[in-house]
Regions:
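Terminal-region recognition feature
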Residues: 1-112
Length: 112
């Protein structure tokens, strides 16, 4: 699973994105919003990607009316496939790709 630090409002995604990871991240976003409706939430991404529908579950939650704080995204190491979309969904002006991070995007395919 990903690492979540509620006190510092930071999430580290260091694995493939699937439904379980998406559910964990969405729950953390809601919990952090309940704790403080304004303070930014930081998401650090080092992921080979994963299931596109799971990534959109996270993205939709980030952009929903239920998550009011800005969500800042940072790419560390690699952001491939669906993880690149997650990185791009961060708050405009607060999407960062560190110097040695690699990005990769390809034609998207839905499962099934």
């Amino acid at each position: 699973m990903c690492t979540i630090d509620h006190a510092s409002r930071r999430l580290w995604l260091n694995q493939t994105i699937d439904d379980n990871v998406a559910q964990q991240i969405c729950a953390a976003l809601l919990a952090m919003t309940a704790a403080d409706k304004d303070k930014p939430i930081r998401v650090y991404i080092n992921s080979p990607g994963g299931t596109i529908t799971s990534a959109y579950m996270i993205i939709n939650m980030m952009m929903s009316a239920e998550v009011t704080p800005p969500v800042w995204t940072t790419g560390l190491g690699m952001c491939y496939s669906a993880a690149t979309l997650l990185l791009a969904a961060g708050e405009p002006g607060n999407r960062v790709v560190l110097e040695d991070t690699t990005l990769m995007i390809h034609k998207l395919k839905r499962p099934g």
